[in-house]
Amino acid sequence: MNVMRNASKVWPFMDGIKVVSFDVEGTLVTPDFSYAIWFEAIPRRYAQRNGIGFEQATKLVEEEYQKVGDQRLEWYDIRYWFDKLDLGIADPVMERCRSRVRYYPEVRDVLSSLSGRYQLAVASGSSREFLRHLLRDIEPYFTSVFSSISDYKRLKTPEFYRKMCQALGVQPEQVVHVGDNWQFDFVAPSEIGIRAFHLDRQRQSEEPNSLASLTHLEVHLPD
């Protein structure tokens, strides 16, 4: 499939859609919780355990992040980082940051509207440790939650989406997916035939398959 060609026009033949799947961070949930974990709580704990200042700890921790990079599974695995940095147990730290979970304003209305017409699923690159907190107030809207990291030990590749469709018992053409990462949420699912939309909240793209808000998704779905 020529993904870039398909990106130049809105997906045709949207009839027969059974499942709408959503990315989580940057799509349903703001970055606040993740920022609090990766750039506040972890450096603070590292500083305390090593007897150094917060700024120095932040610099050292971020250097370790960059050595791994976001194309490796470890990047997304909080238990890996707590072990590597000798920070103890992650769960209490995450629990203390739960108040930082924020949903985008339109999320509940969109999920409420779509849940009566489609099966809703989560297709996330976040670990289940994160999803437990991120989805705490909206999980009842979803019939299935998939974590590429925790469930399949992979990034959000075409194979991940293929396995998701198999688990849901649907063909890729019966699924719409929306998320904010061009590669993981648009290119990868599009390669197997999923009707994917790129969520661009900053409105940096003029592609028809890009949405500025989740409210715009319903325009493309059959009545």
Where do the model's predicted regions map?
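N-terminal helical cap/lid subdomain that shapes the substrate entry/recognition surface
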Residues: 11-109, 129
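Asp-based, Mg2+/Mn2+-dependent phosphohydrolase catalytic module
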Residues: 2-20, 112, 118-223
